[in-house]
Amino acid sequence: MLKLRALAEAKAKAKEGQGQETTPQVIKPSLIRLKKDLENIDLSEQICEYTTYLDENPMRVNLAIKPDIGYYAGGTYYFNVFIKDTYPMEPPVVKCMHRIYHPNIDIDGNVCLNLLREDWTPALDIQSIIIGILFLFHEPNGRDPLNKDAAKTLIEDPLRFENKVNHSLRGNNIDGVWYDKIIY
């Protein structure tokens, strides 16, 4: 008994010498998955760059998307990707940080991309989202719009749509709405 008491006292003294014991920090599964997704991004910096804010809640990834073809080529478009603790079971929320004239992005920055809604599965990742956004810039979808006026113009008169995109990317007013200057 005396040996046990002596051991307990020695342990207590050793603990006091170390200061307070810290509790181990639990790493969220969503953070582990997000870090893995980011490590696996295999895209050129000429097309996409990103910065992360993993200590925020929800976690955030800022994307700089640079389409190289299509109506929107030549611009850099910034998006915030908000990742909740339920990731990858639920998709991230993606917001465009610019007001742009696009059938699949409304003036509030909401993005209409099927893989962020009904087509989402846990097998998809951040690179899938980046590729999806790039595809929207390469091939805007007039059949599933958030900006119905832009979609109608795209479908009925693609040349007029192109002119409106070019005009809007220079920070001009289209149909009573001012757009952010993307191309200088």
UniProtKB/Swiss-Prot annotation:
Organism, per UniProt?
Answer: Kluyveromyces lactis (strain ATCC 8585 / CBS 2359 / DSM 70799 / NBRC 1267 / NRRL Y-1140 / WM37) (Yeast)
The UniProt record lists the UBC core domain at 29-174
Free-text function comment from the UniProt entry:
Accepts the ubiquitin-like protein NEDD8/RUB1 from the UBA3-ULA1 E1 complex and catalyzes its covalent attachment to other proteins.
**Listed InterPro entries:** Ub_conjugating_enzyme, UBQ-conjugat_E2_core, UBQ-conjugating_AS, UBQ-conjugating_enzyme/RWD
Q: Which GO molecular function, any one, fits this protein according to its record?
A: NEDD8 conjugating enzyme activity
E.C. number: 2.3.2.34
Please name the GO terms of the biological process aspect recorded for this protein, alphabetically: protein neddylation
Which UniProt keyword terms apply here?
ATP-binding, Nucleotide-binding, Transferase, Ubl conjugation pathway
Which pathway is this protein assigned to?
Answer: Protein modification; protein neddylation
Which reactions is this enzyme annotated as catalysing?
[E1 NEDD8-activating enzyme]-S-[NEDD8 protein]-yl-L-cysteine + [E2 NEDD8-conjugating enzyme]-L-cysteine = [E1 NEDD8-activating enzyme]-L-cysteine + [E2 NEDD8-conjugating enzyme]-S-[NEDD8-protein]-yl-L-cysteine
Q: What class of enzyme is it?
A: transferase
Q: Which family does it belong to?
A: Belongs to the ubiquitin-conjugating enzyme family. UBC12 subfamily.
What CDD domains does UniProt report for this protein, alphabetically? UBCc_UBE2F_UBE2M (cd23794)
Name used for this protein in its record:
NEDD8-conjugating enzyme UBC12
* A Pfam family per the record: UQ_con
| Annotated catalytic residues | 112
